[in-house]
Every structure is written in structure tokens, then in C-alpha cells.
Design a protein with these regions (language model features):
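N-terminal strand-loop-strand
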Residues: 1-12
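Charged phosphate-binding loop/patch that engages nucleotide di/tri-phosphates or the phosphate backbone
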Residues: 95-122
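Unchanged
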Residues: 16-104
């Protein structure tokens, strides 16, 4: 989770760069925003949202992945106005998140994680 000055606590996300896959973007953005090296374990799903930039409406689709890391080191990206970051237990993270769609993604990710553990795949 990341805390920024505009939106409160949010999950990491970003824009696909030319030649990148969604998976590569996810790994890069987590590294850039938190300094964390992660591996993708599963695709969770996608969400849509819209916002205004000046007089223009912007529509975004975000693809979400369940990832794992060997470290709990986390350094927020100050240049992007993130001023806190961290790893939290599911229930703590759920209550910190600002947006309902991100809470749903977290819930879906937790369900998937528990299933992978149950199957011996985590």
C-alpha cells in the first residue's frame, strides 16, 4: 500500500510504456513506486475508473496481479507524491485503502493467495 498526498492509501499502478506487456508494467511500477522487487504469481483482474484532467475526461483500465517479494523493504517514491509505503496484513490493508474498487481487488487477491496456499502452490 502507498499513501499519497492526493488520494490517501492506494495500490501501486502506472502507465504501460512502449513495448511493455501489462506484466512488465506491473513489476516496473512496483519497483519504481516502492523500490520493491516482485514476481507475478497470478492475474487478478481489471478495473476501470475515470477522472477529469482540466476539461477532459480520462478513462483508465488497470490490470491487477498477485505478486510476491523476498523482502519487506519499501521506499515510497517522493517524486510522485507518495510519502509512506508498507506491507500490511490483509485486514489492515483493506481498511487503509481509499477506493472501493481497490478494496475489491485486494479481497480477490487475498482469496487467490489463500487458494494457492491451500493447493500447495505458494
Amino acid at each position: 500500500n502507498f499513501m499519497n498526498s492526493r488520494d490517501g492509501w492506494v495500490l501501486p499502478k502506472g502507465t504501460v510504456e512502449k513495448g511493455e506487456t501489462y506484466e512488465q508494467t506491473a513489476v516496473r511500477e512496483v519497483n519504481e513506486e516502492a523500490g520493491a522487487d516482485v514476481r507475478i504469481r497470478a492475474y487478478i483482474g481489471s478495473t476501470n475508473y475515470s477522472f477529469k484532467a482540466g476539461h477532459k475526461n480520462i478513462d483508465k483500465i488497470v490490470h491487477w496481479y498477485l505478486c510476491e517479494s523476498d523482502s519487506y523493504d519499501c521506499v515510497p517514491q517522493k517524486e510522485e507524491f507518495f510519502y509512506d509505503a508498507g506491507y500490511y496484513k490483509y485486514h489492515e490493508a483493506y481498511h487503509l485503502l481509499e477506493y472501493p474498487n481497490e478494496k475489491q481487488i485486494l479481497s480477490d487477491a487475498y482469496t487467490m493467495y489463500r487458494q494457492l496456499r491451500k493447493e500447495g502452490n505458494w
